[in-house]
Amino acid sequence: MRTPSKQEDLVKAFKALLKEEKFSSQGEIVTALLEEGFENINQSKVSRMLTKFGAVRTRNAKMEMVYCLPAELGVPTATSPLKNLVLDVDYNHPIVVIRTSPGAAQLIARLLDSLGKSEGILGSIAGDDTIFVTLTRDSTTEQLRGAILGLFEQEL
């Protein structure tokens, strides 16, 4: 059984590796952690850590798909890098559909869910590059679409 300090060291090393934005597979992360001296690291443990910390796959500066952590591991904000990930916002009667860059949907959905009912968002479901957002009783799809476009400073 790991002592808390070893677990904390593992989490620190894991986060530091993802900040490098160079790991395209879970196997590469396992290898890097093993090279740093951590024992009993396997793909399933890395997968659980990626989920726990909200890691997503996105393109790095070299346009490679890599694992990275959302900014500050907190609730993301609509800063310039995020707004560039939103490609299209459309709607039908009950749902607003958002298209994003590949791998960005979960990050954008997390931001939208953090805004919640005050912005007319009841909840969202995200895939790899598509988000379905459902609205509260007091909102219209047109209002919600406008709020989302305003959040990402888009005119789609």
UniProtKB/Swiss-Prot annotation:
GO molecular function list: arginine binding; DNA binding; DNA-binding transcription factor activity
SUPFAM superfamilies in the cross-refs: C-terminal domain of arginine repressor (SSF55252), Winged helix' DNA-binding domain (SSF46785)
A GO biological process held by the record: L-arginine biosynthetic process
A GO cellular component annotation in the UniProt record: cytoplasm
A Pfam family reported for this protein in Swiss-Prot or TrEMBL: Arg_repressor
Alphabetical list of InterPro entries matching this protein: Arg_repress (IPR001669), Arg_repress_C (IPR020899), Arg_repress_C_sf (IPR036251), Arg_repress_DNA-bd (IPR020900), WH-like_DNA-bd_sf (IPR036388), WH_DNA-bd_sf (IPR036390)
Domain of life per record: Bacteria
Residues in the signal sequence: none
UniProt entry keywords in alphabetical sequence: Amino-acid biosynthesis, Arginine biosynthesis, Cytoplasm, DNA-binding, Repressor, Transcription, Transcription regulation
HAMAP family according to UniProt: Arg_repressor
NCBIfam families given in the database record: argR_whole, PRK05066.1
Function of the molecule: Regulates arginine biosynthesis genes.
Full protein name: Arginine repressor
Species per Swiss-Prot/TrEMBL record: Photorhabdus laumondii subsp. laumondii (strain DSM 15139 / CIP 105565 / TT01) (Photorhabdus luminescens subsp. laumondii)
The organism's taxonomic lineage, starting at the top: Bacteria, Pseudomonadati, Pseudomonadota, Gammaproteobacteria, Enterobacterales
Gene: argR
